[in-house]
Amino acid sequence: MWKNRKIDWLILGPYLALSIVGLLEIYSASSYRLLVAGSDPKSLFIRQFLFIILSWGVIVLTYSIRLQVLLKPRIIKAGLIVSGLLLAMMKLGIFAVTVNGAQRWVSIAGIQFQPSEIATIFLILYLSRFFRNDRSVPEKLHIPVLIVGGIAVLVLFQPKIAGALMILAIAGAIFWAAAIPIKKGLIIIGAAIASLILVAGLVLLLEKHHLLPSFFEHAYDRIAMVHNPFLDEHGAGYQMSNSYYALYNGGLFGRGMGNSITKKGYLPESETDFIFSVIAEEFGLIGALLVLFLLFLLCMRIFQKSTKQKNQQANLILIGVGTWILVQTSINIGSILGLIPMTGVPLPFVSYGGTSYLILSFAIGLALNISSRQVKEKNKQVERLQLKKPKLLNKNN
């Protein structure tokens, strides 16, 4: 089954290292809060550990199955339709779970997950198939544009502004890699930017007249706190200001594993959105930069592999997966550093969140499958050349 296939350790290695770091930091960041609340301090650690084991099984399965089976059109279309329906149903309150003023989660059979993450992976698969034949632009370009726009709007009104931007960024990268003509590309980009400006202007206008819908209020508060969270240190700027304290406390080498101060009630989302702050406090600037290096190495390796693909669909899948990890990392780190508003976007493979980790692991499995297939094709070419050599020698003799 794995004959002539070679695991790409520059993809798998950083993934495994980030998973282990994340698991240890989830325990460190959550144990004190759970202990004070009278819960098992290891409960989140155990839950994440189980999801990691399950996800590693998904990677093995995804790596083992033929790529053509994973990329069947019916599966891709069904996944896209189901995720779109779940996003729409959330606005109707069906299966929806509201957390911190936002309806981003769906709860089915006791399992909570974000449909936007499922939509993202199937959107990558759909777009890669749409542009699979060649690098020219198909005549029906309006179809993927409408699908991307529809999903982005549904995600935006959860509200999840960062999620909508991520979807647009991933789709934009795939469109660019598919070599869309400059004129059509500029029209698409212009329409996307104009739509975002229109939405932002509408939000500001509604806020001015105190008509802002409740589902956008928390997003507006986060935007207002970007420049100086210390103006409302105990209110809207509470998490951001304490994140700054954590970064400052860490210094160059950190306070040591488990010795974070801000995780003790000062940083409510310490094991999810702000886990990077806890890492920086416990392991210092050196440890934080190492985590970023692993994420950067993972992305760059995926992008590098995409440039070597002869198959257009495989190339675009790698572009989409690499962009997803890179943009999600940038948004998470950018919000922690105060460069952009707080977003609620987790750090890939490090933050607590079983289903998020599972879906991203499936994406890594696809990347490993494509990478190993490239090695297999090279081995076949070498075998053909070796078979031809004796024939050539016999002719010469």
From Swiss-Prot:
Pfam family of the protein (one): FTSW_RODA_SPOVE
Ranges in coiled-coil conformation: none
Organism the protein comes from: Enterococcus hirae
InterPro entries: Cell_cycle_FtsW-rel_CS, FtsW/RodA
Taxonomic lineage from the root: Bacteria, Bacillati, Bacillota, Bacilli, Lactobacillales
Biological role stated in the UniProt entry: Peptidoglycan polymerase that is essential for cell division.
Keyword tags: Cell cycle, Cell division, Cell membrane, Cell shape, Cell wall biogenesis/degradation, Glycosyltransferase, Membrane, Peptidoglycan synthesis, Transferase, Transmembrane, Transmembrane helix
Catalytic activity: [GlcNAc-(1->4)-Mur2Ac(oyl-L-Ala-gamma-D-Glu-L-Lys-D-Ala-D-Ala)](n)-di-trans,octa-cis-undecaprenyl diphosphate + beta-D-GlcNAc-(1->4)-Mur2Ac(oyl-L-Ala-gamma-D-Glu-L-Lys-D-Ala-D-Ala)-di-trans,octa-cis-undecaprenyl diphosphate = [GlcNAc-(1->4)-Mur2Ac(oyl-L-Ala-gamma-D-Glu-L-Lys-D-Ala-D-Ala)](n+1)-di-trans,octa-cis-undecaprenyl diphosphate + di-trans,octa-cis-undecaprenyl diphosphate + H(+)
Membrane side Cytoplasmic: residue ranges: 1-6, 66-78, 126-136, 182-185, 299-315, 368-397
Protein name: Probable peptidoglycan glycosyltransferase FtsW
GO BP annotations listed: cell division; cell wall organization; peptidoglycan biosynthetic process; regulation of cell shape
Pathway where it operates: Cell wall biogenesis; peptidoglycan biosynthesis
